[in-house]
From Swiss-Prot:
Topological relation to the membrane, as annotated: Single-pass membrane protein
Record domain FIVAR: where: 1436-1498
Protein name, as recorded: Lacto-N-biosidase
Species whose genome carries this gene: Bifidobacterium longum subsp. longum (strain ATCC 15707 / DSM 20219 / JCM 1217 / NCTC 11818 / E194b)
Major subcellular location class: membrane
Thermal response of activity: Optimum temperature is 60 degrees Celsius with LNB-beta-pNP (beta-D-Gal-(1->3)-beta-D-GlcNAc-pNP) as chromogenic substrate.
Activity control: Requires the chaperone LnbY for its proper folding and active expression. Is potently and competitively inhibited by LNB-PUGNAc and LNB-NHAcDNJ in vitro.
Record field: compositional bias (Gly residues): 1535-1558
NCBIfam families: YPDG_rpt (NF038186)
UniProt record similarity statement: Belongs to the glycosyl hydrolase 136 (GH136) family.
Catalysed transformations (reactions): beta-D-Gal-(1->3)-beta-D-GlcNAc-(1->3)-beta-D-Gal-(1->4)-D-Glc + H2O = beta-D-galactosyl-(1->3)-N-acetyl-D-glucosamine + lactose
Residues bound to Ca(2+): D178, D179, V182, D238
Binding of beta-D-galactosyl-(1->3)-N-acetyl-D-glucosamine, residues: H150, K244, H245, W387, D411, D418, C441
GO molecular-function term, one example from the UniProt record: hydrolase activity, acting on glycosyl bonds
Length: 1599
């Protein structure tokens, strides 16, 4: 199907049922016809399962209403075993809290789909599934490919997951995925200057888990089809604000690769195993208060094939059909309060999106909520729109109040044709959207049609045209613009053609509008629009219609709805509740029948208006047609225009008809190619000769066979529309120059007439119009080698020519101003882009059959055309100029290489081939093809085409007849036959006598080739075994008796083999290790995913490298696995089919759960050569105990046992670890354990340790979002380069070209960068796994700014211990090592740490810095000499904590000063013990006894007789402040000494005894006390000493 035919078909198909749709209510979430008592329809062939939260029991069978299950756990257990006709019905009124429904790897079929719905009394309300993000609802999403710059994998919580499921219908459910800590309902939402001051709660973290209400995932390399969601209520899905293309929002369908593309072999495999969607329908549903998307369908990992070459933005039909989603319909839905976009279709082929309502979306796309602008996708959201779709249709939708363009939303439009091809918006209504009505977004948005829409009070503009591509056509819309808005947004700068629109300035004062902004792709062009209440109009609109008062044009413009209906239904367009009648034209309106007959730039046929009225004949202006009949004609064949009488100035309409005396056009032929409204007559009249009183060319009856008809037409009353001096011509009469074509309306005096003008000559130069495609001439080029010719629709903004790639195109020489003058000396201009193999052409389409003469315009005293017009040394490289008829090259010239040298070859070409026989619709092209190296490929050439007065040759039989063969299905081993079919004059015909048939490639090729009967043309074919699935096509040459010939093709489609048409799938099985786990295969059709039966004779065998404990039943394919280990175990299976003996591979996947397993770990783990490893920081002189290791890991489940074994013997808690010990997690009574071999690791290297998209547990990529703010992990990872990323470019990582990091990284540097546009910084962060002293080092040549182009502003590097700065330096010069920083790290890189401390290398960019990126590669190693012994095992402090809380609850006023002071001292000492992680059991007991004694020793205070105690007569007016806790890097070193001393188990010194400044603990370690610390703690010395607590511990608590 051609693009033109396809788009016409789309428009027709999408409009089907419009009258019905408009006449019926379209509630967005209407119940079924059995309102209040709806039940699901089930199929007797399947099983129905019932679930009731109120009346069920999971011990029931679940297969009757009287014995339903209680929980969805039972459904999830059998979900993958659901098959054709099976139903799962949830009882109305049920609530399934903290539950979910995940259906995977199964299918129904066309006759018996799987059904998920409700049963019972609908008055009880839809059954509710509320997953609330619980662990079971979580799954790991992974596209297995880069998807632009977006996040491509992560954990997602989904309430209803449909994964690789076909033929399934889900209906009548309420679905939520709520987070109790998030509260932001749209019904109470409002913008506030302070976040959350309106009572909302929001998690703005970029690392927040993604959530979905319903997710559809295609992942198995096949088509997931026939999925219907109907009558769902999805709300409160509290997903991630930022992530656009994870399963994150209300409803989201997306396709993944089944495997990563890692080699040429996998690339070939992926191209033939495409995960995609077909026939997805989402209807009658409400989606409210979800993040991020409302409804989205089609995002795909296969964008890497679709977008491999954006080209000019056009999308290849075959490409999108293969890799994109097809037959997608989104209809009658209501989306309100989505955090981001309302409804988006992505990578879809011709989807239809209709009767939907969007309301108050983009709730969180603002500067207060979207606080991490570097997160994927950016702070932009539109309403209802496509991304990279082919010919999508959006119609009968309403969009209200897309939010936040004034608060940071970079979009904010109702509609957005984004990076797509052929987008059609029609019959839509937008109101109050915060930015605009329509955006056509950027370079690769091409060929958009926007027609018969209404925009009312969209706030910052109506049309947003930022750098869009060409081919965009905006016509017959009505836009109502208030005081604060405008027609074009301020950023608009690119192409669109505006025709037949009504622009209304809704203010009380005439407005001067900016009608043109920018000139990209030719900028904006206007024709035949109406401008109401404007002080100016576009200069390009020569046919502008102006009006002062809108009430004289439309019945009530501005009165359309200002909000969505609460029900979510569309507003009525007809009937008593019609909401848009204010946009109907009033009687006598200038808009009525004032439109031009538009030829849609994108070939969409015009059928009806905004209200569903048919559009015929000459249309009205604006979006709504009146019922006033238009007598104006329309024609796609004949060009019309006006002639102006030079004397009177009167204008006469003319129609240009091509005929000569010997090649006439009859009245019948003319009338068959013009049309008008229903009820309009059309006829041709001839004016009588004034002198003779006879018709202007009266002939004798003998010479004119139709004279009787003529005479009859002259009888009185024969034609009331004929004027006195006119004769109505009979159908068979040839028309003449000066005849009148007249249209007249029944019952009225309304007429419209055109004088027929003979046109037989076309002159490229004279006919050229800037910005308007000529009726017959076109500027064209090929867009692919040997491909279709396409019209160049963009025009140069400065010169009179069409343009592509900035410099190339077709037009005329001179300036735009010179177009209005005499063009006698003007040349045609033809410029092809050198070297791309895609030629450029002046193209003329023949309006009639006949013979034409092509010549070139001549110029007196000038070089004969064609020639190169620009002086340049082309070094012998040339432009080839060809004359073509359709795709046939008649002749060529290759002598165009020298400036202003006429082409003798082309002159000879025209002399020999300039007289050309054409059929109507043939293309004559003058084609330029410049080879690589031509510096100035611009040609002067000015073609003129004239019909010769020759009778058209009698058509050859190959012209009169068409012959074809129907495509025929064939089966291997069975003969199929097909006959040749002839047509002539539009109908079936017998084969003409003497016709002969033969294959073009000669004789037959044996039994596996088709055989043709030479006399009848019948073709037979018996496919051989090797031709399963083949399409066998042969070219047939048909030779007629008159010597003419034609070619056609005969095609046989051989049925596929079982291997070709079937998928063999094993749904995933989950179970415990040590038990028999079983899975039987499922067979589905590759074409649509429908369930299929197992072909007879199919056998199964284990594939290569099957794991231990696996077996397969040879006959039925059941795989059994008894695994001794946990984890994911895959069993390869080879499936062999009986029909052709072909084998296919499948895989049974088992998620084996060990009875016990590692839960979480603060230490690094890995799998090395198939063995699990845990890395622990110990060495011979820095040991680590078993207890310390076990404290850093958890078991799953939490009650499982964990221990360390050596040679099979369990070690005691105090035993020191050794290499190859085994960390084991086990369950009582099980022989299966989860084991990790212990390995020592005491050195960490940022570069060597770096892992793509892995944070922790030792190294992290972090950032601050404000100066001196809290450090947080960076959630996003660059899609191409190996680094953590925020704000698109910045963060820490390693400097390498891609994610595939090599094993040897010695030549790779660490990399850190920070955004100069925001506060804070980025960090390479290391978390200490144990206490000790570490040495930080960097490479000898580091650090330095890694990129040229620094501008003198600084990137500040710091080495930090927790929040203390150890070293810092400013990097300002590109590629110059910072000696200051390197020396500081060498001097001060030894740092005493406690377990859990942070060492960070940070980068902070100065505002406005260029290239804020440095090379630095930190290495951190424990120093053996200063590594402390084992950390103390934590002791029980619960009793002491309770006693402290008891003391805090006492009131000082009740007790004597002396006893109270003793209590305070004991309480503070006890608090110090609580705060000390190293406190021993003895210290805890001592503190507990002392505090208990102090409580027991409290003495009650006697009653104070003085009710007015006197104030302190000598208060301290200037209390001494605490010393600065962070003096910064300029502080002088101090000796770290203090004036106090302490005794007990903790001493007043630590591993590092020397600090700096007033706080010696800055670099001296956490056990160091400073002078200021000691002085401040003097009052506590005695008690802390008595309690056995060192002074350092007290000081540490105060810090």
């Amino acid at each position: 199907m051609t693009s033109r035919q396809g788009r016409q078909a789309i428009a027709a198909t999408a409009a089907m049922g419009v009258a019905v749709a408009l006449a019926l209510p379209t509630a967005a979430f209407a119940q079924s016809a059995t309102q209040g008592k709806e039940t699901a329809t089930t199929t007797s062939s399947g099983t129905t399962y019932y679930v009731s939260s109120a009346h069920g029991d999971d011990a029931n069978a679940g297969t009757s209403e009287n014995a339903p299950w209680k929980s969805l756990t039972k459904v999830n257990d059998i979900a993958s075993d659901l098959g054709p006709g099976d139903s799962v019905l949830l009882e109305y009124g049920s609530e399934f809290n903290d539950q979910y429904l995940h259906i995977k790897d199964t299918a129904g079929n066309a006759d018996a789909p799987i059904t998920i719905s409700a049963y019972g009394d609908a008055d009880e309300g839809k059954p509710v599934i509320a997953s609330n993000g619980v662990k079971g609802s979580q799954w790991e999403q992974d596209y297995r490919a880069n998807v632009g710059n977006h996040k491509n994998k992560g954990t997602v919580s989904t309430t209803l997951l449909l994964k690789d499921v076909s033929y399934i219908t889900v209906s009548n459910l309420e679905i939520t995925n709520d987070d109790a800590d998030v509260y932001d309902p749209i019904d109470t939402w409002k913008w506030t200057d302070t976040p959350d001051s309106d009572g909302t709660k929001l998690d703005r973290s970029a690392s927040r888990m993604d959530r979905t209400g319903v997710a559809g995932i295609a992942e198995n390399g096949a088509t997931m089809s026939n999925v219907t969601l109907d009558n769902l209520y999805i709300h409160d899905v509290d997903g991630n604000i930022y992530n656009k293309h994870m399963a994150n929002g209300g409803i989201y369908f997306m396709a993944h690769y089944p495997m990563e593309n890692t080699s040429a072999e996998t690339d070939v495999w992926l191209r033939e195993h495409v995960s995609r969607f077909d026939h997805v329908t989402i209807r009658n549903s409400t989606v409210k208060d979800v993040d991020r998307w409302g409804i989205a369908v089609g995002y795909t990992a296969y964008l890497n094939y679709i977008d491999a070459n954006y080209g000019d933005g056009s999308i290849d039909d075959a490409l999108i059909a293969k890799y994109g989603s097809t037959n997608v319909r989104i209809e009658n839905n209501y989306v309100k309060g989505a955090g981001g976009d309302a409804i988006t279709l992505m990578y879809c082929d011709r989807p239809v999106i209709e009767h939907n309502v969007g309301d108050s979306v983009s709730k969180h796309i603002n500067t207060q909520d979207y606080t991490q602008p570097g997160s994927y996708g950016g702070r932009v959201a539109a309403g209802i729109w496509p991304w990279r779709c082919k010919d999508p249709v959006f119609q009968y939708n309403e969009m209200y109040n897309n939010l936040n363009a004034e608060h940071g939303n970079g979009d904010g439009q109702a509609w957005d044709a984004d990076y797509g091809d052929g987008t059609l918006y029609q019959y839509n209504y937008s109101y109050g959207n915060s930015f605009a009505s329509l955006m056509i977004c950027n370079w690769y948005a091409v060929n958009t049609t926007f027609r018969y829409n209404i925009s009312q009070n969209d706030r910052q503009g109506v049309f947003d045209l930022p750098s869009n591509g060409p081919g965009n056509h905006i016509y017959n819309n009505t836009v109502y613009v208030d005081a604060d808005s405008q027609v074009l947004t301020k950023r608009s700068n690119s192409q669109s053609l505006f025709e037949n629109n009504i622009f209304i300035n809704a203010t009380n004062t005439k407005k001067t509008e900016t009608w043109n902004r920018g000139s990209q792709n030719g900028g904006q062009t206007y024709d035949n629009n109406m401008y109401v209440n404007y002080a100016n109009k576009p200069t390009s609109d020569a046919n502008a219609i102006e009006a002062d008062d809108v009430s004289a044009v439309l019945a009530g413009a501005g009165s359309a709805p200002t909000s969505a209906l609460k029900s979510g239904a569309e507003h009525a367009r007809t009937g008593e509740k019609a909401a848009f009648d204010g946009y109907r034209p009033v009687a006598g309106s200038k808009a009525i029948n004032a439109g031009k007959v538009v030829s849609d730039l994108n070939d969409y046929a015009v059928e009806n208006d905004f209200l569903g009225n048919a559009v015929k004949g000459r249309p009205d202006l604006g979006a709504v047609e009146s019922d006033v009949v238009s007598v104006t004609m329309a024609s796609s064949k004949y060009e019309t225009g006006t002639e102006t009488d030079s004397g009177t100035g009167d204008k006469t309409k003319v129609i240009h008809v091509t005929f000569t005396d010997k090649n006439p056009v009859t009245v019948k032929e003319l009338l068959s190619n013009v049309s008008a409204d229903k009820g309009v007559d059309k006829a041709v009249y001839r004016v009588a000769d004034a002198k003779s009183g006879k018709s202007a060319d009266a002939r004798s009856a003998e010479s004119e066979p139709n004279m009787l008809d003529r005479l009859l037409s002259l009888l009185p009353g024969s034609d009331r529309n004929a004027k006195d001096d006119e004769t109505k011509l009979a159908d068979s009469e040839p028309v003449r120059d000066g005849d009148i074509l007249r249209f007249s309306a029944e019952g009225t005096d309304e007429t419209d007439e055109y004088t027929i003008r003979q046109r037989i000559t076309w002159d490229w130069v004279a006919d050229y119009e800037q910005g308007v495609a000529d009726f017959d001439w076109k500027a064209q080029r090929r867009t692919s080698a040997g491909g279709e010719w396409t019209t160049i629709s963009a025009y140069d903004g400065s010169w009179p020519n069409t343009v592509y790639d900035q410099y190339y195109g077709v037009g005329v020489n001179g300036t735009l101003a010179e177009l209005s003058g005499d063009r006698k000396q003007t040349h045609g201009l033809l410029i092809d882009k050198p070297g791309d193999g895609l030629p450029t052409a002046m193209a003329w389409k023949a309006p009639e059959s006949g013979t034409v003469m092509l010549s070139l315009k001549t110029f007196a005293d000038k070089i004969a055309e064609p020639y190169l017009r620009q002086n340049a040394d082309n070094a012998g490289k040339k432009v080839t100029l060809s004359l073509m008829r359709n795709d046939e090259t008649l002749c060529s010239a290759d002598d165009l290489s020298v400036y202003q040298k006429s082409s003798e070859q082309f002159a000879q070409c025209l002399a020999e081939h300039g007289s050309i026989d054409v059929q109507e619709g043939d293309w004559i092209r003058i084609v330029a093809d410049a080879e690589t190296g031509v510096k100035a490929p611009s040609l002067h050439i000015s073609p003129v085409i004239t019909y010769e007065d020759k009778a058209p040759a009698a058509p050859k039989q190959n012209v009169r007849y068409d012959v074809s063969y129907a495509a025929t299905d064939a089966v291997v081993g069975t003969q199929s036959a097909v006959a040749a079919a002839f047509t002539a004059d539009g109908g079936e015909a017998d084969a003409p006598d003497g016709v002969a048939f033969a294959f073009k490639d000669g004789g037959d090729e044996g039994e596996a080739s088709p055989v043709i009967d030479a006399s009848t043309g019948a073709v037979t074919f018996t496919p051989a075994a090797g031709q399963y699935g083949a399409t066998v096509t042969r070219t047939v040459v048909v030779t007629y008796a008159d010597g003419s010939s034609d070619e056609t093709t005969v095609t046989f489609r051989v049925a596929q083999s079982h291997a070709q048409r079937l998928n063999v799938l094993y749904p995933t099985v989950r179970g415990d290790a040590g038990t028999d786990l079983k899975r039987t295969p499922k067979f589905t059709l590759k074409a649509d995913g429908a369930a299929a039966s197992v072909p007879e004779g199919t056998t199964f065998a284990l594939g290569a490298n099957a794991p231990a404990g696996a077996s397969v039943d040879m006959a039925n394919g059941t795989v059994t696995l008894n695994s001794g280990v946990g984890g994911t175990v895959t069993v390869p299976v080879t499936v062999t089919f009986a029909d052709d003996g072909a084998s296919v591979s499948s895989t049974a996947r088992f998620e084996v759960t060990a009875p016990a397993a590692l839960g979480s770990s603060e230490l690094e783990t890995a799998t090395v050569d198939g063995v699990n490893v845990v890395y622990a920081p110990f060495s011979a002189d820095s040991p680590m105990t078993v207890a310390q290791l076990l404290a850093k890991v958890t078991a799953e489940p939490s009650g499982a046992d964990k221990g360390v074994y050596r040679d099979g013997v369990r070690l005691e808690a105090g035993a020191e670890l050794a290499e190859n010990d085994v960390l084991r997690f086990s369950a009582k009574g099980s022989t299966v354990s989860d084991d990790y071999v212990v390995k020592s690791k005491t050195t960490w290297d940022w570069v060597n340790d770096f892992q793509v998209r892995v944070q922790g547990p030792i190294w992290y990529g972090q950032r601050q979002t404000e100066a001196d703010g809290v450090w947080s992990d960076i959630a996003d990872f660059d899609a191409t380069y190996p680094n953590w990323m925020y704000e698109t470019y910045y963060g820490p990582g390693v400097d390498y070209a891609n994610h595939s990091l090599p094993t040897d990284r010695s030549a790779i540097h660490g990399l850190i960068s920070d955004s100069p546009a925001s506060a804070g910084g980025s960090a390479m962060a290391w978390k200490a796994p144990k206490a000790g002293t570490v040495k930080v080092s960097i490479r000898e040549d580091e650090p330095y700014l890694r990129q040229d182009g620094s501008n003198g502003k600084a990137l500040t590097l710091r080495l930090m211990h927790d929040d203390k700065v150890v070293c810092f330096a400013d990097l300002t010069v590109s590629k110059q090592r910072s000696e200051e920083f390197a020396n500081c790290v060498a001097d001060k890189g030894e740092i005493a740490v406690e377990a859990g401390d942070w060492i960070r290398v940070t980068a902070t960019s100065a505002s406005g810095m260029n290239k804020p990126s440095a090379h630095i590669s930190p290495v951190i190693a424990y120093m053996a000499a200063s590594t402390p012994g084992p950390e103390p095992v934590p002791v029980d402090k619960s009793t002491l904590k309770a006693t402290v809380e008891e003391a805090l609850g006492l009131a000082e006023s009740d007790y004597t000063d002396e006893s109270w002071a003793a209590l305070v001292a004991a309480r503070d000492a006890a608090q110090t013990v609580l705060d000390d992680d190293a406190a021993t059991a003895e210290q805890v007991e001592t503190a507990q006894n002392a505090l208990r004694d102090a409580i027991d020793g409290l003495e009650k205070k006697p009653v104070d007789p003085d009710p007015n105690p006197k104030p302190d007569p000598n208060p301290d007016p200037d209390p001494t402040p605490d010393p600065d806790p962070d003096p910064g890097p300029d502080t002088k070193p101090g000796d770290g000494s203090g004036n106090g001393s302490g005794t007990g188990n903790g001493s007043g010194s630590g591993n590092g005894s020397t600090g700096s400044g007033s706080d010696g603990a800055t670099t001296g370690g956490k056990l160091t006390a400073t002078g200021a610390d000691v002085a401040g703690a003097a009052a506590m010395v005695a008690l802390t000493a008595a309690a056995g607590i060192g002074l350092a511990a007290a000081a540490r608590r105060r810090r």
